[in-house]
Amino acid sequence: MRLGPILAAATLATLLAACNRSQPATPTGSEPKAAAAAPSDAEKQAMLASLPAPYNTADLANGEAKFALCQSCHTVAEGGANMTGPNLHGVFGRKAASLPNFKYSDALTAAGWIWEPQHLDHWIEKPQTFLPGNKMTFAGLNDPKDRTDLIAYLMVSTGYKPQ
């Protein structure tokens, strides 16, 4: 008798049974937020048009492409995880180093500014030059148009609300 097919069937049955097990209940007060539906392209374009100049004429596709340089350390979705860097949802209008569940550098904690597009522009140009002692290892984005596009993408993707 051949054991190969029997072992394969037993393994498959075990995997299927494991997938069907109920998950432990989420502790009260820590229910994950339901993910908001991603805006349509038309909604993104409307949000873009409502941004202050020069961001209202930015190239969102290029901004999203430039964010690929950031996404190994940052997320943008509401309720998204902190990674090596903090989640960026709601970053505009927020005091620097103010997320309670992320350990910022002493330099950024002492900075005391509010994140606005102009601060972010200087920050992503050369983070270590703009604020020596911060923990961000990104070398920077030299092209001003790329920075404008990236900032516009972040404004559209992170819940920007004009101040």
Protein language model annotation of sequence segments:
Residues 1-17:
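Sec-dependent bacterial lipoprotein signal peptides
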Residues 12, 69, 94, 126, ...:
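Residues within well-ordered alpha-helical secondary structure of globular protein domains
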Residues 19-22:
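Bacterial signal peptide processing site
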Residues 32-66:
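Electrostatic cytochrome c docking/interface patches
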Residues 60-64, 78-116, 138:
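Gly/Gly-Pro-rich "capping" loops immediately C-terminal to redox-active cysteine motifs
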Residues 63, 67-76, 150-154:
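The canonical Cys-X-X-Cys-His
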Residues 69, 84, 132-134:
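Envelope-exposed proteins and targeting segments
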Residues 116-163:
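C-terminal capping alpha-helices of c-type cytochrome domains
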